[in-house]
């Protein structure tokens, strides 16, 4: 299924493991991605007919020397297929590609763009031109459940093997027929591969990004793999590829061989060099002028946008607090007044001269929130007025100091109650239900009730504050994005937020919309119902909360999900309805998730009259305890810890 990678765990014997790999590995799905945000097609349309034609033509492909295929039907459907470098480019290769294509269209019905990696081949199709395009995202990586005994020695061996693979890939790049390398270091077996249509530099960049991420993906583990549309890497502690290819690998040419080649080629090559030296400077000058024009045009546009933003920010001068006033109000930011801390800074309680209690967020100089995020939070919050959103009183700027001044919420954040074994008893079912309803109404206001749609992008329990009646207020808008009503989705290369709450299409592809907030809301509701953190302890190894809840729901053991603290106070029908709403919100396909308008409507209706669609599997769904997917548990350097 989409966004799901599978990793073989350890078996009881080497013989059984080897048998399974050699017999079944070709048809094991490593990674499938359905680009839901890329659009759909309907049956009997031109795209549908051409895609079917392309799929049906695959068994008749003619074997190529490198197992790579670029296929296009009427320029409307474009596909790329590639067999692993150790697979003979014969009918076995074509059979794997055909199987992959059939699995892909079944997994991603009516989706315009999708890709799949099987053990021995990959296949992708789309409506756009992809030949020769290096695309390191979307990516997926998976690690073994088994840890190595000698982590330091294993890491050194793997590092040496990565260096060796890189050198072999560079040598393979010279042929431009196959960009593949495999190697063995002690008991570690590894391979790496790029699609042959990539340039030498693009292949090197693609694999360099993968190699740099290996410690994050698989540190101390006995195996792991990483796939993206353009390249692939895998390592194990058992032979999973044809070992004969390691002896056939082309090594970097020595200087002696290079000199011999130059002598053999003679004067014809010298003439070619003369021509190249004459043409290259002219082409470089032309390209330089083109790039300079584009750069100046973009800079002028950015300058205009920046000036507009600065003018809008200056219009908030009435909300500006004197820095000394805030410093005195917090007793010089005394530790005794500290009420919270996050990745962006520390929050203090304070009292203004008129007696008004305030909460002051003092942004850290080294925090992930820069001036842009600070201004975003100020500009957005000044436009928002809703009882379930925290109220911004103002801000203060002095040199490198940046302060945000909010209304003081006495009970701090939801997570401090929900996951505290003592305080959680204060949250009976009625209070938890009111929190769910309040957060849903706050999100609905952001998505549909404010001047422009706003996507929060970092909804989680620590960003939900509780007032004196334990009613919720959504806070922290530094990562929020504002849209116009005609365009409520976007793609970003900088993924920010908290991983366990991120929708799969956002975490893996950078695509976000109002449905990414819906996913985060679903995770939050599951935490409120169960009293458990997502990816927390007590769920079983390698299991996140949506998977844990889904498994109980399909097995008919949903009541086991209810926080034991609630057993005497919860309304069974109401809690089960909330569970189904949450599971609907964390579905893998964003188009199947309800809108917040639908969620509020379902929560506001009588429990007997609610019509809930049957939810499908959640994003990052883990099919078995025998398999592990590391995506929910990893922190990326691009993420801002909050």
From Swiss-Prot:
Reaction equation(s) it catalyzes: L-seryl-[protein] + ATP = O-phospho-L-seryl-[protein] + ADP + H(+); L-threonyl-[protein] + ATP = O-phospho-L-threonyl-[protein] + ADP + H(+)
Entry GO MF terms: ATP binding; protein serine kinase activity; protein serine/threonine kinase activity
Residues annotated as glycosylated: 27, 40, 44, 70, 145, 173, 258
Pfam families hit by this protein: PK_Tyr_Ser-Thr, Stress-antifung
Protein kinase domain mapped to chain residues: 333-620
Coiled-coil region list: none
Residue intervals annotated with topology Extracellular: 25-274
Signal peptide (residue range): 1-24
Keywords: ATP-binding, Glycoprotein, Kinase, Membrane, Nucleotide-binding, Phosphoprotein, Receptor, Repeat, Serine/threonine-protein kinase, Signal, Transferase, Transmembrane, Transmembrane helix
Residue(s) carrying Phosphoserine: 462
InterPro entries: GNK2 (IPR002902), GNK2_sf (IPR038408), Kinase-like_dom_sf (IPR011009), Prot_kinase_dom (IPR000719), Protein_kinase_ATP_BS (IPR017441), Ser-Thr/Tyr_kinase_cat_dom (IPR001245), Ser/Thr_kinase_AS (IPR008271)
Transmembrane segments: 275-295
Modified positions (Phosphotyrosine) in chain numbering: 406, 506
Enzyme class: transferase
PROSITE patterns referenced in this protein's UniProt entry, alphabetically: GNK2, PROTEIN_KINASE_ATP, PROTEIN_KINASE_DOM, PROTEIN_KINASE_ST
One Gene Ontology cellular component: membrane
EC number: 2.7.11.-
Protein name: Cysteine-rich receptor-like protein kinase 27
Organism: Arabidopsis thaliana
The encoding gene: CRK27
């Amino acid at each position: 299924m989409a966004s799901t990678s599978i990793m073989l765990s350890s078996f009881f014997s080497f013989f059984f493991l080897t048998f399974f790999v050699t017999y079944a590995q070709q048809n094991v799905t490593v990674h499938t991605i359905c680009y839901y945000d890329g659009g759909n097609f309907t049956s009997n349309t031109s795209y549908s007919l051409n895609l079917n034609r392309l799929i049906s033509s695959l068994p008749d492909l003619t074997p190529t020397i490198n197992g790579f295929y670029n296929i296009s039907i009427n320029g409307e459907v474009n596909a790329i297929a590639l067999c692993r470098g150790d697979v003979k480019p014969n009918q076995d290769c074509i059979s794997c590609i055909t199987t992959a294509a059939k699995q892909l269209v079944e997994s991603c019905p009516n989706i315009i763009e999708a890709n799949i990696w099987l053990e021995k081949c990959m296949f992708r199709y789309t409506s756009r031109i992809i030949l020769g395009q290096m695309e390191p995202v979307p990516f997926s990586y998976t690690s073994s459940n088994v840890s190595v005994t000698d982590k330091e020695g294993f890491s050194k061996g793997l590092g040496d093997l990565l260096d060796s693979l890189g050198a072999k890939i560079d040598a393979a790049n010279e042929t431009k027929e196959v960009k593949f390398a495999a190697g063995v270091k002690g008991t570690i077996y590894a391979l790496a591969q790029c699609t042959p249509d990539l340039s030498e530099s693009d292949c090197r960049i693609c694999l360099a990004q993968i190699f740099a991420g290996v410690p994050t993906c698989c540190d101390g583990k006995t195996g792991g793999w990483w796939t993206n549309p353009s390249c692939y890497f895998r390592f194990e502690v058992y032979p999973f590829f044809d070992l004969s290819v390691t002896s056939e690998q082309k090594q970097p040419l020595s200087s002696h061989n290079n000199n011999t080649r130059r002598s053999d080629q003679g004067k014809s090559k010298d003439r070619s060099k003369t021509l190249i030296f004459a043409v290259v400077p002219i082409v470089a000058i032309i390209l330089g002028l083109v790039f300079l024009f584009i750069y100046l045009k973009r800079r002028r546009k950015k300058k205009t946008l920046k000036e507009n933003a600065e003018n809008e920010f200056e219009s908030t001068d009435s909300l500006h607090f004197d820095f000394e006033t805030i410093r005195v109000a917090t007793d010089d930011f005394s530790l005794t007044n500290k009420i919270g801390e996050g990745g962006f800074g520390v929050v203090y309680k304070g009292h203004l001269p008129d007696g008004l209690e305030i909460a002051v967020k003092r942004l850290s100089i080294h925090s992930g929130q820069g001036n842009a995020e600070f201004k975003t939070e100020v500009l957005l919050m000044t436009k928002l007025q809703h009882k379930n959103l925290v109220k911004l009183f103002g801000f203060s700027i002095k040199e490198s100091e940046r302060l945000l001044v909010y209304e003081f919420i006495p009970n701090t954040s939801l997570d401090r109650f929900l996951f505290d074994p003592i305080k959680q008893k204060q949250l009976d079912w009625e209070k938890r239900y009111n929190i769910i309803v309040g957060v849903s109404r706050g999100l609905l206001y952001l998505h549909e009730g404010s001047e422009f749609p706003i996507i929060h992008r970092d909804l989680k329990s620590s960003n939900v504050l509780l007032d004196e009646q334990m009613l919720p207020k959504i806070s922290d808008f530094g990562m929020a994005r504002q849209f116009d009503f005609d365009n409520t989705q976007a793609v970003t290369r900088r993924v920010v937020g908290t991983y366990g709450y991120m929708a799969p299409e956002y975490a893996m592809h950078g695509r976000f919309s109002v449905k990414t907030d819906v996913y985060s809301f679903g995770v939050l509701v599951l935490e409120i119902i169960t009293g458990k953190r997502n990816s927390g302890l007590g769920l079983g190894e390698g299991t996140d909360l949506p998977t844990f809840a889904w498994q109980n729901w399909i097995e008919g053991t949903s009541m086991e999900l209810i926080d034991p603290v609630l057993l005497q106070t919860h309304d069974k029908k109401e809690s089960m309805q909330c569970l189904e709403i949450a599971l609907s919100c964390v579905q893998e396909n964003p188009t199947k998730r309800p809108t917040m308008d639908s969620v509020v409507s379902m929560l506001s209706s009588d429990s007997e009259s609610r019509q809930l669609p049957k939810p499908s599997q959640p994003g990052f769904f883990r099919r078995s305890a025998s398999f592990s997917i590391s995506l929910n548990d990893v922190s990326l350097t691009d993420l801002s810890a909050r």
